[in-house]
Regions:
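Generic short beta-strand
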Residues: 104-106, 121
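Hydrophobic beta-strand-centered segment that forms part of the acyl-chain substrate-binding groove
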Residues: 48-95, 116
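Short, conserved beta-turn/loop elements at beta-strand boundaries and strand-helix junctions
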Residues: 96-101
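Core beta-strand residues in small-molecule sensory/regulatory alpha/beta domains
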Residues: 78, 106-108
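A structural microfeature
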Residues: 115-117, 132
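Hot-dog-fold acyl-thioester-processing enzymes
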Residues: 2-70, 126-152
């Protein structure tokens, strides 16, 4: 398998991921179907971690394996994205506290916010039980936090 370059880049503590809107992402009017914003936000969170130096596979296959579940997701849709739009998913990991991480995200077009999301992701053991973040996760994520962290 060939390693591809990490998608996106950091701008301060924010990770920016470019996303193109394809025909498959839209409804019959050419507007992005609402559920696809959730997919874009997920890509932003995953590529944030990858750009910070750790992927989901690294976390699951480490000596202290873990995974994530979304415990809360609040989305505010502001304006529609349309077919062929070049979007940016902005992701900021705010706080790590206990088993939870607060992540704030936005989808933008030409600097204009189209949607915002507040996500609470929880760390779990591979059997689904809640757990605190691993040392590996803390080592990679804490430098990028924009808010206080109980794990520091």
């Amino acid at each position: 398998m060939t390693d591809l370059p990490t998608a996106g880049r950091f701008d301060g503590k924010d990770h920016l991921l470019p996303v193109r809107v394809y025909y498959e992402d839209t409804d019959f009017t050419g507007v992005v179907y609402h559920a696809n914003y959730v997919r874009y936000f997920e890509r932003g969170r995953s590529d944030f971690l990858r750009a910070a130096g750790i992927g989901h596979t690294d976390l699951m296959e480490s000596d202290d394996p873990l995974a994530f579940v979304v415990a809360e997701l609040n989305i505010k849709y502001v304006r529609p994205a349309r077919i062929d739009d070049a979007l940016v998913v902005r992701t900021r990991y705010e706080v790590v506290k206990g088993v939870r991480m607060l992540i704030r995200q936005a989808i933008e077009r030409d600097g204009e916010v189209l949607a915002r999301a507040d996500v609470v992701a929880a760390c779990i053991h591979l059997d689904g039980r809640p757990r605190r973040p691993s040392k590996l996760l803390i080592e990679k994520v804490v430098p990028w936090l924009s808010g206080p962290s109980a794990e520091q």
